From Swiss-Prot:
Gene Ontology cellular-component annotations: plasma membrane
Entry similarity comment: Belongs to the 4Fe4S bacterial-type ferredoxin family. RnfB subfamily.
Entry's cofactor comment: Binds 3 [4Fe-4S] clusters.
Protein name per UniProt: Ion-translocating oxidoreductase complex subunit B
Source organism per UniProt: Shewanella oneidensis (strain ATCC 700550 / JCM 31522 / CIP 106686 / LMG 19005 / NCIMB 14063 / MR-1)
A Pfam family it matches: Fer4_21
Binding, [4Fe-4S] cluster 3: 124, 144, 147, 150
Protein's GO biological process: electron transport chain
Length: 193
């Protein structure tokens, strides 16, 4: 046998041995995550805004699993809070006074003043701001959670938080609240003549 063939076979056997060893170690020393934290995190809106007092949704989910209150997520609103309370088996509470706002606000960039520095784009946790370097930026209001993280880094102070005015596009129609009654059809008797 040639030296080259022996080297290839030896390296293949060595790679196979270490592959099996790593596979065994991965199964033997597997670290399980907390499934409750994963479920809580799936319920949270994933805005990573920090309005709850934690640096993101995962740390807040871990805090809830450790006994923290479920009413600290403003972007999620009452619906998210009720789902969290149901999962944790606690009574739903009103949203935290600091978290509760009567009118939803979104970021608004005064485009004529924007210098295109991209600092607001980098600060936005939900990618609701579009634009490019040295060009005007704008906010996708449908995606904006109102977390206010884009206002601080703006060097020219051209970002305002404005209330969302309700119109036909964003009105909460609550179609599931309309009462629906099922009417049973009764067979008609044939007319006799």
């Amino acid at each position: 046998m040639s030296t080259m063939l022996i080297a290839v076979i030896l390296l293949t056997l060595l790679a196979l041995f270490f592959g099996v060893l790593l596979g065994f170690a991965a199964l033997k020393f597997k670290v399980e995550g907390n499934p409750i934290v994963d479920e809580l995190e799936a319920i949270l809106p994933q805005t990573q805004c920090g309005q709850c007092g934690y640096p993101g949704c995962r740390p807040y989910a871990e805090a809830i699993a450790n006994g923290d209150k479920v009413n600290k997520c403003p972007p999620g609103g009452t619906a998210t809070m009720e789902k969290l309370a149901s999962l944790m088996g606690v009574e739903p509470e009103p949203l935290n006074a600091e978290a509760q706002s009567q009118v939803k606000k979104v970021a608004y960039i005064r485009e004529d003043e924007c210098i295109g520095c991209t600092k607001c784009i980098q600060a936005c946790p939900v990618d609701a701001i579009i634009g490019a370097g040295k060009l005007m930026h704008t906010v996708l209001t449908a995606d904006c959670t109102g977390c206010d993280l884009c206002v601080e880094p703006c060097p020219v102070d051209c970002i305002d938080m404005v209330p969302v005015t309700q119109n036909l596009k964003n009105w909460n129609w609550r179609l599931n609240a309309i009462p629906v009654t099922l009417i049973q059809e009764t067979p008609h008797e044939e007319k006799r003549g």
